[in-house]
Amino acid sequence: MDSRRDFLKKAALLSGGASLWDMLPDSIQKALEINPPQGSTYLDAEHIVVLMQENRSFDHCFGTLRGVRGYNDPRAITLPNKNLVWLQKNAAGDTYAPFRLDIKDTKATWMSALPHSWENQVDARNDGKYDRWLDVKKSGNKEYAPMPLTMGYYNRADIPFYYAFADAFTVCDQHFCSSLTGTTPNRLYLWTGTVREKPSIESKANVRNSDVDYDDLAHWTTFPERLEDNNISWKIYQNELSLPMGFKNEEEDWLANFTDNPIEWFSQYHVRFSTGFQKFLAAQAKELPTEIADLEQ
């Protein structure tokens, strides 16, 4: 089996030929050329990179990966009808098992996101019965709504890059949402470990995406602040803020942040007053007289 560094080198080469390797920054090339000393552990790491992706379950991506608690889980829960949880029944009485979403020969990549908010997550769980996935996780696309897409998964042939990562690095199974909700609450957990202002049941649980944003700022302590308290530096890398920054047309489609970083909505970071947003507002103000004149013609 390739070492992790060998894997990363090959991935860079296979992704776009030898030229891609040459395009990597010198610092990255240098880092990939360094072999870790024997006997080193994670305690010797100087940098930790955290990337959060969403809208896909562990089984959806790695349910067929060898050695994990996936679709061959010997301890899968049993539904009230005595079937294993993999055999889901809808309101019409039809039963569906997990099936492969063939990326090459189907339109699986265009199926769009299935419902994944507080209400339908709780409804699918159904008081711990886990038996309403087909009814409450239907596609919002009318063409796809009758399809049991929530039971679909990818395998190694569909997402070889992810499986190569899984082969080269440690994979943790038993993945689940920190909060049985949607994007913002789970990203709040990533940044803070909670969805509440105070660790008390009297404190509101922010379980909906709209509960925390620029109009409803959060104030509790975040992990970056805790890092600073321990003299550990940190950085956030993203193309733009969730505020308008001037991207246009396809730039917005490919480079926008899509409100996926709720750290922006904590009052202590003052992101609303960022330099980039102020420049955008100034540019818009200069264009406003021309836009008004065009409308008056």
Task: Describe each PLM feature range.
Residues 2-297:
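N-terminal pro-sequences and low-complexity stem/linker regions of secreted or lumenal proteins
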